[in-house]
Amino acid sequence: MTRVFCNGRPATVDDLAGPALRSDGHFTTFQLRDRAVHGLDLHLQRLDAASRVLFDTALPATRVMNGLRAALDAISTRDASVRITVVPGAGEGGLDVLVSLALPAEPDVAPMRLRSVVFQREFAAIKHAGTFPLFEHQRRARAAGADDALFVDAAGRVIEGSVWNLGLWDGTTIVWPQGDALRGTRERLLQAGFTALGVRQSTRPVVPGEMRAPTAAFACNARGQRMIASVDGHALALDPQLPALLAQALATQAPMAVDDPVG
């Protein structure tokens, strides 16, 4: 069962009425394990940056963390799927901070079959609440026999997936698609990890035709990493070394405890 808290206390019907009827907020999601989060600082930076853009208001990390700790303490949990949503409201600075807690989730392990579609999110740099197109394209991809949608911009460049970023691997270099997309926290953690490991990386335009064997590819988001099996029926390599390399890169980035002080 999902539990929702608003500004550090259990949410009321009135607290949730606005977010239920509008889509003018923004959010971040992550997996909490033993009261620690990979890339917690990146999630806090995301929330503050989006609040400044959408609402012309800073969102102090201490406020977010106080609300998160209060929610975790209220249900006495150390592991959860967490969503923090920021919406206009009666809270400090005219903003309400909603913390939603659900059961912890693990990534699917089966490689994904993707169906490409020409689509680019509005205000792509912000993780905003206008998610209908993402899940509608995902639904259509599944109806067509794929597992998810791969977004390609009007110029024919691969940019991102429905709720994930992606990278390519040729055995020596990780390639990150260049384009107007939401830059994910897991993507940034992996980039830092590959740098720490000395793995070569590049960011450049990628076209769907590149996504086939002998190239391998993976999807990543806050839930984890997942290999990509095919795009539009064209198989990619399933390099058995890539999942281990991704895990090694992530392992260089220590989780951050939610009870530690934040700046």
Residue ranges of predicted features:
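Helix-start/capping segments and mature chain N-termini
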Residues: M1-A70, V87, G91-G263
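Phosphate/pyrophosphate-binding loops at sites that engage ATP/ADP/AMP, CoA/4′-phosphopantetheine
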Residues: A71-S76
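Ordered, amphipathic secondary-structure segments that act as subunit-interaction surfaces
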Residues: T77-V86
